[in-house]
Design a protein with these regions (language model features):
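Short glycine-rich loop/turn motifs that provide flexible caps or phosphate-binding loops at active sites
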Residues: 18, 43, 71
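A beta-strand edge to alpha-helix "cap/lid" segment located at domain peripheries
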Residues: 35, 49-119
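A short gly/proline-enriched turn/hairpin at secondary-structure junctions
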Residues: 33-42
């Protein structure tokens, strides 16, 4: 049985894959910091909203979660993401996201560190 925090992070990751900007923005603090290792760092909910608008490229995504670990205000989720573009070309990625909440009960995400590798 999933805990409340495990469900929260599972739903958040599903929102990322589906491009559900509303769900994503409701789940983070105003001062969110999202560090994508080897790429960009997004600081603040306004910058995150701008980045989410730029992510809708018409690709279809599926996610297979391998592990979802929570402890207190922190969580780690890893797995595979499968992407199919408009022409049918597929790409596959391995990912690991590390999360920190602003508080233990009913917290929102205030820090994300993401590692993504094309495989």
């Amino acid at each position: 049985m999933e805990t409340k925090n495990q469900l929260f992070f599972r739903e958040f990751n599903e929102a990322l894959v589906k491009g559900d900007a509303e769900k994503i923005l409701q789940s983070v603090t105003d001062d969110i910091v999202w560090r994508m290792v080897g790429n960009d760092t997004i600081k603040g909910i306004d910058k995150l909203e701008q980045a989410l608008q730029g992510m809708d490229n018409g690709n279809q995504f599926e996610q297979d979660t391998e592990h979802l670990i929570t402890h207190g205000k922190e969580a780690a989720v890893n797995g595979l993401i499968h992407s199919t573009d408009k022409s049918g070309e597929q790409r596959h990625y391995s990912f690991c996201d590390i999360y920190k909440l602003n508080k233990h009960k009913n917290g929102k995400i205030n820090e994300i560190i993401s590692y993504v590798l094309e495989i």
